[in-house]
Amino acid sequence: MKFQLQHKTIFLRQLGIQPYEPISDAMHLFTEQRDTNTPDEIWLVQHPKVFTQGQAGKAEHLLSLGDIPVIQSDRGGQVTYHGPGQQVMYVMIDIKRARIGVRQLVTAIEDTVIKTLAHFGVKAYARPDAPGVYVNEAKICSLGLRIRKGCSFHGLALNIAMDLEPFQRINPCGYAGMKMIQLSDLVPGITVEQVQPVLVEKFCQQLGFKLNS
């Protein structure tokens, strides 16, 4: 019983605004060094302006980058944009230990965001043909994962109160003309700080974790 309780605990790390590459490096190091007894973790972070190109990324989806850097990432998916006012949540879960599949984890993350948005009175949905979460046919949350040694890393990026213009410089997630939306378009005045605790709570509820911050 003690063993089970230990592994249903998840640790939360509040990282503020941090450059993409050091966080990516730390995430890789955490995943490489973890073993079967390592507790799972959630990392909440915002990144300065950056485009990240996923494993499936193609150069033709980079349209007019301007002065925003492009960084290659080993997450799934194509190109996306990160910037202040967007909540990124990285999920380091031992899915083998948790006995969940990758598709189950993706669905749990999408449902987490859908329920978080519902908390603020916004109706959102997932699409079977394009991972992520959508509101009125516009994308509000991007999702990209990597699995290594039976453990997940990378995660989601939820648009809350940010400058959406850089999304026009790319084909978001490889879809030309994909319309992007943010929560503040629907709930004026909403902040990242208001959304964070709800997002974490809904994620823990979805997968049965007890939070240890």
From Swiss-Prot:
Protein name according to UniProt: Octanoyltransferase
| Reaction equations catalysed | octanoyl-[ACP] + L-lysyl-[protein] = N(6)-octanoyl-L-lysyl-[protein] + holo-[ACP] + H(+)
- One term under GO cellular component: cytoplasm
Q: Does the keyword Acetylation apply?
A: no
Q: In which pathway does it act?
A: Protein modification; protein lipoylation via endogenous pathway; protein N(6)-(lipoyl)lysine from octanoyl-[acyl-carrier-protein]: step 1/2
* Keywords from the named record: Acyltransferase, Cytoplasm, Transferase
Q: List the residue(s) that the UniProt entry marks as the site Lowers pKa of active site Cys.
A: 139
Q: Any further remarks? A: In the reaction, the free carboxyl group of octanoic acid is attached via an amide linkage to the epsilon-amino group of a specific lysine residue of lipoyl domains of lipoate-dependent enzymes.
Looking up InterPro entries in the UniProt record yields: aa-tRNA-synth_II/BPL/LPL, BPL_LPL_catalytic, Octanoyltransferase, Octanoyltransferase_CS
Principal localization reads cytoplasm
Residue stretches making up the BPL/LPL catalytic domain: 36-211
Q: Which GO biological process entries does UniProt record here?
A: protein modification process
